[in-house]
Amino acid sequence: MVIRRKMNKMIRKGMIGAVMLGAAVAISGGVATAGYIQGTHVKTDLPGPFHITMSPDGSTLFISNQSGHSVTFVDARTQKVTGEVAVRVQPEASAVTPDGAFLYVCNAESDSVSVVDIQRKQEIKEIKVGDWPSGIKISPDGKTAYVACSGCMWNAIDVIDTGRMEKVRSIYTSDYGPRMVEISPDGKTLVAILDTVGSINRSVDFIDIASGRVVENRVIHESSNLRDVVYTPDGKYIAVTHQTPKNWLPVCEAENGQVFTNNVTIIETKAGGKVARLPLDDLNNYDGNPYGMAMDPKGKYLYIGVRGMHRVTILDMDKVLGLVRSSTQEELDYLRDDLGLVRDYLVARVPTGLGPSSVCLSPDGKFCYAANYFSNNVTVIRTAVD
C-alpha cells in the first residue's frame, strides 16, 4: 500500500509519463523510495530477438534472434550494435562462460548448441543435443553446461563438457518437457521446470548435480506454460513464471474460451517446502504470458517480462517472501487467486517494446534489459538500485 500511494503521488505530480520519439518510447518514473525507471530502445533491425544475456563484466549484451538465426552483440555502454554471428536454426536461450570467452547458444529447431568465440565473433563448434534445446546454464566453475531439451516427448537435460566442447551424458527428468534450468547459488542443485504438454499440474524437478538424480518433484497445481525459473541469492526460494488456466476445455485454445491469469509461483527449496502461486495481473484472454525473469544481485527486486502486455513487471521480493514466510500452505492455497494481493508487492509496470520475452540485469543491478520479440529491439530500464 505504501508503494502504491507513492506511485499515485508521483503520477499526480507528472513525474511518470511517456513520450513518443519516432519508433522509440522514453518512460520515466519512480520505484519504491529510491532511484527511477527510464526506458529507452536499442534498435537491432533483426527478426525475433528472443533471449538476452550479458557478459560477466557487463560490457556486452548478447541477443538471440529466433527468426534471424543469429546472435547480435551490443555494446552496453554506447547501446550500439557491434556485431552479428550466424548460428543454427531458431536460437533461443544462451549462456556465457564465467571467463567471458565463449557463448553457448541453444538452437531449438536444429537440436544443437552453438559455441561462439566472443572475441572472434564466430561460431567455432556445433554440438548435437536432444530434441528442441530451449534452456541452458553454465556451472559457476565454467566446466559444465546443462541444456534443457523441451521436445514434447523428451525428458532429458544434456550435459556438455565445456573444455572438450562435447556432450558427455544426459540427466533424465521425472516428466516430459524440461524448458529451462537454473543452478543453485551453492552449485549443488539443478532445478528444471517441466512444461509437460497436456498436463494441468506442471512441475519442477530438483536434481542433485553430483549424482544426476532427481531428489524431489514439486507440483504447481493448475499451471500451464511454464517459462522461466530463477533462484533467490540465498538459495532458499525459486520463482517460476507461468499461466493458470481458469476453465479447461477439451481443445485448449484461447478462441474457444480458455481464460488465463498470469502468475509467478514461489517455491521454498527445502524438502517439502511451501508452494505459493501468486497473481500478477487481472484475468485476460491469453494475452499476458509472463516470460523471462531476472533477480537483482541482492534479491530485492524481481523483473518479469510480460510478453503479451508489452511491459516489465517489477516485484518487491521482501514483500513477496514476507507473505510466503508468514502464511501456512493452506492460507497460500486460499489466497492464490486473490488479485488484491498484487498491490502489496507490485513496484511498477514499465512499458517496453512489443513482446518482451527475456530480461537480464547488469552485474551491478543498475540496468535491466528486455528483448522485445515483436518490435525487434531492446528496452533499457534504469532500476532503483543505487
Swiss-Prot record:
GO terms for cellular component: anammoxosome. Induction: Is among the most highly expressed proteins in the proteome. Part of the hydrazine synthase complex that forms an elongated dimer of heterotrimers composed of one alpha, one beta and one gamma subunit. This is Hydrazine synthase subunit beta. It is found in: Anammoxosome. Gene3D superfamilies: YVTN repeat-like/Quinoprotein amine dehydrogenase. Its main location: other. InterPro entries: Host-pathogen_enzymatic-act, N2O_reductase_N, WD40/YVTN_repeat-like_dom_sf, YNCE-like_beta-prop, YVTN_b-propeller_repeat. Pathway: Nitrogen metabolism.
